[in-house]
Amino acid sequence: MRIGLVDVDGHNFPNLALMKLSAWHKCRGDTVEFADPAARRYDKVYMSKVFTFSRDCTDRYDCEVVRAGTGYRDYATILPEEIEHICPDYSLYGVKEAYGFLTRGCVNRCSWCVVPHKEGEVRAHADIEEFLDGHKHAVLLDNNVLASEWGLMQIEKIVRMGIRVDFNQGLDARRIARTPEIAALLARVKWIRFLRMAYDSRAMQDDVHKAIELLRKHGVPARRLFFYVLIRDDTEDALGRIRELKALGCQPFAQPYRDFEHEGKPSWEQWRLAYWCNRKPLFHSVDYEEYRKKRT
């Protein structure tokens, strides 16, 4: 069979589902490639979409086309077990690190997050060696690995193996703040670049400060602490959180709120604040009030 794959979001970040589908089909002797509607015919095409705001692919194929992913608001379709737990085909994107989940789900019920709707409660998913494939670096996509005993055991294993990792979706600062043993464990991890957390609301302030304090106490410098900062309607509140993190020596990254159930887009002010925060030369050289005056 000839299999075509379409990464609807683009190729800026490897699509894990497509890498697993590629590995499974290649094991069956099928030919797999990123689909080109002008180049050849396919027996089957898979289109995967992670983000609702990504423009859908309008290419037409004269074969069975499977569309799936959170970006299609499809929360029910999952990969069969034999595909879900296959080692991904990393050659598809030519990446140098492994990708995967140790756990799935989350214990939190954040109104802005799709994970509770799609995955439910946190649970064990895979051992790091299932998808490591000899790599010494791994990007882990867990949504709340610290809420899982299995997840904590896997982090211990990662430390023993000496693997460099990036928990790309962020770690829960509240669990770090309230469990000093977790802070001590994370300080033993080799990070690819940053230890990522989130500062989504002012209600998290005490926990965020405590997490930073504990991690610094165990030897993780503030400059290695990266925080996703959610920007909702109150941009002044988000600006305050961003400035707070900057003063502490941490790395804020602003994310304008998107309603995953509707088509609403972030406001101009949300975009402007995020642009200023995320362009680090600008962020470190110009105060936001000065920048805002120039961009009105």
Segments the model singles out, each with a brief description of its role:
Residues 15, 43-45, 57, 74-82, ...:
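Short, charged, surface-exposed secondary-structure boundary motifs
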Residues 29, 41-43, 61-63, 96-98, ...:
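Short, well-ordered alpha-helix to beta-strand connector turns
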Residues 15-23, 152-156, 183, 209-212, ...:
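Short amphipathic alpha-helical segment that frequently serves as the phosphate-/nucleotide-binding helix
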Residues 5, 10, 46-49, 114-211, ...:
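Core AdoMet radical
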Residues 1-2, 54-55, 64-103, 107-137:
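N-terminal [4Fe-4S]-dependent radical SAM core
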Residues 189-196, 203-296:
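A structural motif corresponding to the C-terminal lobe/cap of the Radical SAM core domain
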Residues 13-15, 23, 123, 285, ...:
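Charged phosphate-binding loop/patch that engages nucleotide di/tri-phosphates or the phosphate backbone
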Residues 1-67, 72-74:
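A short, structured N-terminal alpha-helical element that caps or precedes a catalytic domain
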